[in-house]
C-alpha cells in the first residue's frame, strides 16, 4: 500500500499535509522496470510521471547528430522525479528514461495529478515550484553539455 509517509520521503512531497498526501497516494501505483528496459522513450506521448523508489534510472536524450544517447542525469535516490512531461503540455516525453538497474517506481496519471494540483492552489504551487526546480536543473545540465561540445568543437 502506498502511504502518505512514503510520499513524504520524496523532495516533491516533503512537508505537505498528510491529508493532501493521502490523495496523491490514492492516485499512485507501483511499477517495476527491469535493467536495460525503457520506462519511456523520448518523443512518446507522456501520460504518467514517476517517483523513484529504488534502483537506478538514467534520463537520456538522443541528439540526431550523435550515434549514442547523452545521459542528462542518473537517478538513484528515493523520491526523485522521473518524467515530468507526463503532466505538462504538450505531453510528450522530452527524454528517455532507461533503467540501469531493476527499478521500482510510483506512477501517477498526469491528468489526475494535475487535477489535485488545481484543487489546492497553495500546495499545488509548492509542488509546481519543486518540479520547476527539477526542470531548471536538468536544463542547466543540458546547457552545460551543449556549451562543452561547442567549446570542444571550436578548439579543433
Predicted regions and their residues:
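Cytosolic regulatory regions built on CNB/CRP/Popeye-like sensor folds
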Residues: 1-156
